[in-house]
Amino acid sequence: MYAETDFLFALIKDDDWLGDAAETVYRDHRDDLWTSQFTLIELLLVAYREGRDSERVVTNAARLVDVHGDVDTVVAAATYVEDHGFTPFDTLHLVESGDDTIVSSDGAYEGVSSRLDLTAIDEE
């Protein structure tokens, strides 16, 4: 059974209106539940938007069910949101880029990653 974002968020949030139903489903189907890295990315976005601890939300969700896809990248991205104040998409780009230079006009990467600043390129 595929666990969608609202189901996992209901399990993680203390005050979610779907919390009781989600807990019942989780209790009855725990071994059959799984999700994808895309659900974790959506949880990262929702947690960021709601001012919640992104790292805690993503990490807790990843512990609740089997996750297909690249869990480590999403968890690492959530850590950058909390530790460095990045936006979720900036952190996903940062983590996914690895050691490569990021080509961007976004100054958020300064001091954290090598960046080729598009605004500093002379047009010929």
Language-model region placement:
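Anionic, Ser/Thr-rich low-complexity intrinsically disordered regions
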Residues: 39, 45-49, 57-61, 111-123
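Short, well-structured N-terminal submotif of metal-dependent ribonuclease cores
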Residues: 1-34, 47-57, 124
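Acidic, PIN/NYN-like endoribonuclease modules and their adjacent C-terminal/linker elements
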Residues: 66-67, 94, 99-124
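Alpha-helix C-terminal capping segments
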Residues: 24-30, 43, 47, 59-64, ...
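A general structural signal for well-ordered alpha-helical segments in protein cores
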Residues: 19, 40, 58, 74-77
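Alpha-helix capping/helix-boundary segments
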Residues: 7, 39, 73, 93, ...
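Acidic catalytic patch
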Residues: 14, 63-83
